[in-house]
C-alpha cells in the first residue's frame, strides 16, 4: 500500500484470466476452471480493492440454485438477498468465504501450491512446481482437429457474434457490464464501452468465429462469451503466431453449469482450425504456470472522489486538504513538442515501438496496420501523444487507454474513470518526464486514477510520481509453450 505520507490506494482489481480451449485463460485470458463461479476474464486492472481480477463468488446465488425446483436459466427469479442492504450482503458473503477457505481461486503461489488443478492438468501448460529451462511447444501441432463444436448444457446454443450489428454489440456490452470482473469487495465492476469492445475485439486479422457466444435457445438471451484475437508474439528468441484470449464471461446464474471450460475448449478448437496452437493470456489468479508476474500501481488524480468511493483511504495523520495538495499536478504538460498522434506519425511510431521492445523477453510484434489500430487516438478509448523536436522529428511517445468502472451502491458517484498505461517509448525525453506529462494529460481529460503495471521500465517512475502499490498481482501465461519465467521488468506486453 502507499507510504504513510500518502493516501493509501486500493488497486483496481486486475484482469481476470483469459483462456483457451484447453488453454489457459488466455488472452487467452485464463480462467480458474476449478472454481467456475469466479470465472470472468479481462486483462486490465479493475478499480480498487484488489488487483486480483477474479470475480468474487456469489454464494448467495449458488445457494438459491441448490434449492430444489429453481431452474438454472438466465430467467431465474432474483435472489431474495438483493433486498438486504449492500453492507449486510457483503458481510454475509465474507462470512461464507471464511467457511470455504481453500475453495476460491489462488491469489498467490503459496495458495496455489495447496490447490488441485484438474482442468489445467489436462492442458498443455507446465505444472506449477515445474522448473522450466527449455524453450518450445508443450505438445506438437495437431493434424486431426475436431470438426464439431463442443456440447453445451441443454437449452444453450453457440452463436458467433456479429459485432458489426449494434444490437448484438449492445447485448455483449450488457452481458459484460452485469457479469464481468468485479473487485473482491463488490464495489467496482469494469464498464467496457461498446466502442472499446470494437477496438479490443476487431484488430487487423480478426475473425468472426472467434467472437464466440452462448445463447439460451428459447429466449435467445446472451449468457456466455469468449474471444480470441490474432497476435504475433516474440518470446525470448522465438516469434510465434498466437492468439490473445479475452472477455471470458458466463452469466452469474449459469456459473454452476461449468460452462467456462466448454467455452475454453470451443475457442481453442476454433483457433486450432485456423492453424494456431499457442496463446498468451493474463489472470489475476494463479494457475499453472505463470511465465511472469506483474503488479498494478495506482496514481490518484481525483483523490477526493477516490476516497469518497473507498477506492482509496486517508492515511494516518493526513487530512483531505493535505492529500489533495500531495497529488496536485501542473495545469499543463512541460515537454516541448508534445502533441496528439496524427496519421502522419504512424510509420515513425511503428519504428520507435519495434526498436524499443527488443530489450524485453515477451513482446508483441506489430505491423504498421496494427500500430495504427492500437495507437491512433480515439476519444474515450485510446490516447497517444508524440514528442516532436525542433527539427520536426518524432522522438518519443506515450499512450494510455480508457477503462471506466461502475461504482456499485454509492449514492452520488456512479462511474470511476481510469486511464491504463499502454506503451511508452523514450529516446530523447526522460521517461520520468514523459509519464509526468501523461498524468497531467489524463487529469486534464477528467480521469480519476491512472493505473500502470510494474513491467518494462515502469518501476523507474512509479514511486517518484506518487503511485501507490496495488494489493494483487497480474500473472502472464502462455498456452502450449514452455520457457523460463521472467521478471516483470522483462515483460513488454500490455493486454487490454
Curated annotation (Swiss-Prot):
One of its GO terms (molecular function) is glycylpeptide N-tetradecanoyltransferase activity. It catalyses: N-terminal glycyl-[protein] + tetradecanoyl-CoA = N-tetradecanoylglycyl-[protein] + CoA + H(+); N-terminal glycyl-L-lysyl-[protein] + tetradecanoyl-CoA = N-terminal glycyl-(N(6)-tetradecanoyl)-L-lysyl-[protein] + CoA + H(+). The keyword NAD does not apply. Residues 55-66 have a biased composition (Basic residues). It is found in: Cytoplasm; Cytoplasm, Cytosol; Membrane. GO terms for cellular component: cytoplasm; cytosol; membrane. It comes from the Eukaryota. Keywords: Acyltransferase, Cytoplasm, Membrane, Phosphoprotein, Transferase. Its EC number is 2.3.1.97. Belongs to the NMT family. This is Glycylpeptide N-tetradecanoyltransferase 1. The gene is NMT1.
Amino acid at each position: 500500500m502507499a507510504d504513510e505520507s500518502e493516501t493509501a490506494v486500493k488497486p483496481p482489481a486486475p484482469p481476470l484470466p483469459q483462456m483457451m480451449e484447453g488453454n489457459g485463460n488466455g488472452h487467452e485470458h485464463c480462467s480458474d476452471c476449478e472454481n467456475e463461479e469466479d470465472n470472468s476474464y479481462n486483462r486490465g486492472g479493475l478499480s480498487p480493492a484488489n488487483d486480483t481480477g477474479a470475480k468474487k463468488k456469489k454464494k448467495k446465488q449458488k445457494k438459491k440454485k441448490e434449492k430444489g425446483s429453481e431452474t438454472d436459466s438466465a430467467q431465474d427469479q432474483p435472489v431474495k438477498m438483493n433486498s438486504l442492504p449492500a453492507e449486510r450482503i457483503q458481510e454475509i458473503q465474507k462470512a461464507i468465504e471464511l467457511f470455504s477457505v481453500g475453495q476460491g481461486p489462488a491469489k498467490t503461489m503459496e495458495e496455489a501450491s495447496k490447490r488441485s488443478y484438474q482442468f489445467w492438468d489436462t492442458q498443455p501448460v507446465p505444472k506449477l512446481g515445474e522448473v522450466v529451462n527449455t524453450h518450445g511447444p508443450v505438445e506438437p501441432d495437431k493434424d486431426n482437429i475436431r470438426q464439431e463444436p463442443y456440447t453445451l448444457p441443454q437449452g444453450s446454443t453457440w452463436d458467433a457474434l456479429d459485432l458489426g450489428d449494434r444490437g448484438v454489440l449492445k447485448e455483449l456490452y450488457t452481458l459484460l457490464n452485469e457479469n464481468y470482473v468485479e473487485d473482491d469487495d463488490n464495489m467496482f465492476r469494469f464498464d467496457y464501452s461498446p466502442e472499446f469492445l470494437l477496438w479490443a475485439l476487431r484488430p487487423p486479422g480478426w475473425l468472426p468465429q472467434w467472437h464466440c457466444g452462448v445463447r439460451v435457445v428459447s429466449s435467445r438471451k446472451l449468457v456466455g462469451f469468449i474471444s480470441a484475437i490474432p497476435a504475433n508474439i516474440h518470446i525470448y528468441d522465438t516469434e510465434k503466431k498466437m492468439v490473445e484470449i479475452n472477455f471470458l464471461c458466463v452469466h452469474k446464474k449459469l456459473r454452476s453449469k461449468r460452462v467456462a471450460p466448454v467455452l475454453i475448449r470451443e475457442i481453442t478448437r476454433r483457433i486450432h482450425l485456423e492453424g494456431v496452437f499457442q496463446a498468451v493470456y493474463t489472470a489475476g489468479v494463479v494457475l499453472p504456470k505463470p511465465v511472469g508476474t506483474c503488479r498494478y500501481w495506482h496514481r490518484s488524480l481525483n483523490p477526493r472522489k477516490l476516497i469518497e468511493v473507498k477506492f482509496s483511504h486517508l492515511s494516518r495523520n493526513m487530512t483531505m486538504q493535505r492529500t489533495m495538495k500531495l497529488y496536485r499536478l501542473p495545469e499543463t504538460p512541460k515537454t516541448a513538442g508534445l502533441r496528439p498522434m496524427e496519421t502522419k506519425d504512424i510509420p515513425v511510431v511503428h519504428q520507435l515501438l519495434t526498436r524499443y521492445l527488443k530489450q524485453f523477453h515477451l513482446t508483441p510484434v506489430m505491423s504498421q496496420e496494427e500500430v495504427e489500430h492500437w495507437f491512433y487516438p480515439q476519444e474515450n478509448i485510446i490516447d497517444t501523444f508524440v514528442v516532436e523536436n525542433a527539427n520536426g522529428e518524432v522522438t518519443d511517445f506515450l499512450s494510455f487507454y480508457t477503462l471506466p468502472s461502475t461504482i456499485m451502491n454509492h449514492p452520488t458517484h456512479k462511474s470511476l474513470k481510469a486511464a491504463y498505461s499502454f506503451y511508452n517509448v523514450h529516446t530523447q525525453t526522460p521517461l520520468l518526464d514523459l509519464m509526468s506529462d501523461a498524468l497531467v494529460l489524463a487529469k486534464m481529460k477528467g480521469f480519476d486514477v491512472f493505473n500502470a503495471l510494474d513491467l518494462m521500465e515502469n518501476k523507474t517512475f512509479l514511486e517518484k510520481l506518487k503511485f501507490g502499490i496495488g494489493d494483487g498481482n497480474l500473472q502472464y501465461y502462455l498456452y502450449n509453450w514452455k520457457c523460463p519465467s521472467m521478471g516483470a521488468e522483462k515483460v513488454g506486453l500490455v493486454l487490454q
